[in-house]
């Protein structure tokens, strides 16, 4: 009997098992995308005071050996209470590894100090070697901190090389020498760009979009404002006829205005650098923003100084929480990348030695 199905096989159609039907609805879009999300800080001064005072006491009892544990507890508290899109930050550094690095760093410091008592030449060589190691120290410290920092399940990663660090360091020296320090803001910009342009969260890359003139404005406007105030005070006194009546009083008034200006100029610079940096930083296609007010920031820093002095340092935790909360909660992120797609990069473990050498020799590598 003739079977027509064998003679004319059934043609596969798009709805057959060989050609599954295309989904009628597109993949679900992450509802977080396209919105501006604000950072939040959940810490409190009372909680941090408990951590801070215990850290101080244990460092005294252990002659400073508890310092790595104190550092990790402090960073974990601040990181762990910082939140963005319902994800918390975390610091995963291991205290005993930091302790080993600190002991080696202290050993280097002791050797240089002892040698300096017997040979000026050896001391100079030691200082020069340490100075030449600064780019390596900075780069290694940033890598260590990034490797041990997390956002949700995504680790941070720093890809800057030693070659790039030394090239930036050399350019900074040349610029500083040939401009007699007048272009110091350019050095700040180069350092910020080196740090941020090589920083990743998972596989999402940070980028600093600001140019060096933005940092010149950020740092020199407070300076011009300071000298403008001094000039205005001088003109007002001249118009009031005080210049010739009481020159001694005039000198003291200028000294007071000068000291007040110096008291305000650095916090104002710090505020403007903070604003310039974060309003011009992106991570992949997502963009950071800050509504930080430069005068509010300056007020917080100055009053923190006053409160810490009047309280003999006991209000240090309150001051630290106050400033950090303002910085964090002024930040927001216009999210254009799916945070669920963050994939960690393969990283090697990094030594804490460089960070501890930086701490011992007071080399500031903060962002």
Which residues make up each language-model segment?
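Interfacial aromatic "cap" segments that immediately flank transmembrane helices
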Residues: 38-58, 90-111, 153-177, 203-231, ...
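Intrinsically disordered cytosolic tails
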Residues: 260-367
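Membrane-interface alpha-helices
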Residues: 70-86, 187-205, 319-339
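Membrane-helix interface segments in multi-pass membrane proteins
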Residues: 71, 109-130, 229-266, 270, ...
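Low-complexity, intrinsically disordered extramembrane tails and loops of integral membrane proteins
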Residues: 1-40, 333-367
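Membrane-water interface of transmembrane alpha-helices
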Residues: 65-78, 133-147, 183-199, 267-278
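Membrane-interface amphipathic/juxtamembrane segments adjacent to transmembrane helices
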Residues: 36, 71-95, 142-154, 340
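Hydrophobic, aromatic-rich membrane-embedded alpha-helical segments
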Residues: 53-73, 131, 170-190, 302-322
């Amino acid at each position: 009997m003739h079977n027509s199905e064998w003679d004319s096989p059934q043609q596969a159609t798009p709805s057959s098992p060989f050609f599954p039907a295309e989904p009628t609805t597109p993949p679900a879009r992450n509802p977080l995308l396209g919105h501006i999300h604000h950072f939040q800080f959940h810490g409190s001064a009372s909680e941090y005071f408990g951590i801070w005072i215990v850290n101080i006491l244990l460092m005294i009892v252990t002659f400073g050996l508890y310092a790595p544990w104190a550092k990790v507890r402090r960073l974990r508290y601040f990181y762990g209470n910082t939140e963005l899109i319902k994800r918390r930050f975390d610091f995963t550094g291991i205290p005993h590894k930091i302790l080993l690095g600190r002991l080696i760093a202290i050993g280097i410091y002791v050797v240089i100090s002892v040698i300096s008592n017997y040979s000026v030449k050896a001391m100079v060589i030691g200082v020069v070697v340490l100075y030449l190691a600064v780019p390596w120290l900075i780069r290694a410290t940033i890598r260590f901190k990034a490797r041990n920092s997390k956002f949700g399940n995504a680790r941070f990663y720093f890809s800057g090389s030693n070659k790039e660090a030394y090239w930036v360091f050399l350019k900074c020296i040349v610029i500083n020498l040939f401009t007699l320090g007048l272009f110091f803001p350019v050095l700040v910009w180069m350092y910020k760009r080196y740090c941020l342009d090589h920083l990743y969260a998972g596989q999402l890359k940070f980028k600093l979009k600001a140019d060096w003139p933005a940092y010149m404005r950020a740092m020199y406007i407070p300076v011009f404002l300071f000298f403008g105030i001094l000039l205005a005070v001088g003109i007002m006194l001249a118009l009031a006829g005080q210049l010739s009546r009481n020159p001694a009083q005039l000198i003291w008034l200028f000294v007071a205005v000068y000291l007040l200006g110096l008291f305000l100029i650095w916090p104002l610079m710090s505020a403007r650098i903070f604003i310039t940096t974060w309003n011009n930083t992106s991570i992949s296609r997502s963009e950071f923003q800050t509504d930080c007010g430069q005068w509010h920031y300056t007020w917080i820093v100055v009053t923190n100084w006053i409160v810490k002095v009047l309280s003999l340092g006991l209000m240090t935790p309150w001051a630290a929480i106050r400033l950090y909360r303002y910085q964090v909660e002024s930040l927001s992120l216009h999210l254009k990348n799916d945070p669920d797609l963050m994939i960690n990069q393969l990283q090697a473990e990094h030594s804490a030695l460089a960070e501890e050498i930086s701490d011992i020799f007071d080399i500031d590598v903060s962002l």
